Amino acid sequence: MTTLENRPNTALLVVDVQNGAVARAHDRDTVVANVASLVDKARRERIPVVWVQHSDERQLPRGSDRWRIVPELAPDDAEPLVEKHYGDSFEDTCLETVLSGLGVGRLVVVGAETDECIRCTLHGAFVRGYDATLVSDAHTTGDSTEWGAPPPDQVIAHTNLYWTYQTAPGRTAGTARTKDVDFSGPS
């Protein structure tokens, strides 16, 4: 029930599933496998898959191995790839233009890192009028406990909890497990 007019379509938004972003991420292999499963499902159902790739000189320098999308995933040449430099995938990128061109008003979000780019992108989408479903077992983050953060499994669980109950007028949020994702409507 997006607030965006004439935007009836859904897209799978794959955020920052890059070597450097998931190298030490919680439950990395399972999460990447779940993302791959959803990419395959979206392609079979002719749902747009939109890739987002973070670039910064400190952690993910453009062109480096750390910057590359993980080898288990391969964007199709016809699938949009949006390069970003900030946590919110919409900030100073062409993502809004890409989604508008595809008639997308609902996003199914997967990727990394939960407590950074996933949260920022979810909120960025929601305030821009998108419906946003977070796939609860297809996002991950690294361990930042040495800086006072909760363990990664708790960060993920907390994000799933609060996104399940996120509300705003005219928009739908929520979570779904990989096996329960329905690209045809709210999960």
Whereabouts are the PLM-identified features?
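Active-site-adjacent betaalpha module
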Residues: 1-11, 37-45, 60-187
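Short beta-strand segments at enzyme active-site cores
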Residues: 13-15, 48-54, 135
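Short acidic, Gly/Ser-rich segments with clustered Asp/Glu that frequently serve as metal-coordination loops
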Residues: 18-23
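Short glycine-enriched, charge-decorated loop/helix-capping segments at active-site entrances
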Residues: 25-30, 59-60, 149
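…and closely analogous acidic/polar surface helices at protein-protein or active-site interfaces
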Residues: 25-41
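Short, well-ordered beta-to-alpha junction loops that form the rim of enzyme active sites
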Residues: 54-55, 112
